Amino acid sequence: MLINHSFQVDQPIDQVWNFFDDVPLVAACVPGADLTKEVGDDQYEGDVTISAGPVKLEFSGELKIKSRDNTKKVIVLEGAGADKKGRGAASVVLDASLNSLGGSTRVDLAIDLTISGAAAQYGRGLVADFTEVLIDQTADSMKTRMTAIAEGRDPMAVGAPQTASGISIAFSAFTLAVK
């Protein structure tokens, strides 16, 4: 499933680039994500937990920087994991491209998400709607954390919820589905 998402940050491109070059900080913006260990240069192990009502998916896997272009301000992250209960797997390639808008920056995300097993049974439309809500929450967290950095505050003290869960995601996804 291919998903494109763009947002604007009221920070200069070099500050936004420094943020995206910090994988643990970027991962902390994803609801339910937790990097547990750095296993090598630009390679990490971690977990992602997503729950909605009675459905709870817990993935364990790896995330790495696949490529980085400091001149063009493009970074590609690649992740893959398996459900801890053996009910499926997921992989993602996130391509983040930054474009200067004077004193602010446009962030263009291209996300290629593949889900198999139990999570895939809910149908492409529902998974796409849930994913869109999670991406919106991630983008909001990124903007909040970048603002905290610019203001000299601890970016880890603000931002994403600990887990991606339940009612708010389900309601937002339902709202998207009926539009």
Language-model features: locations:
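Glycine-rich portal/gate segments that line the openings of hydrophobic small-molecule binding cavities
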Residues: 38-80
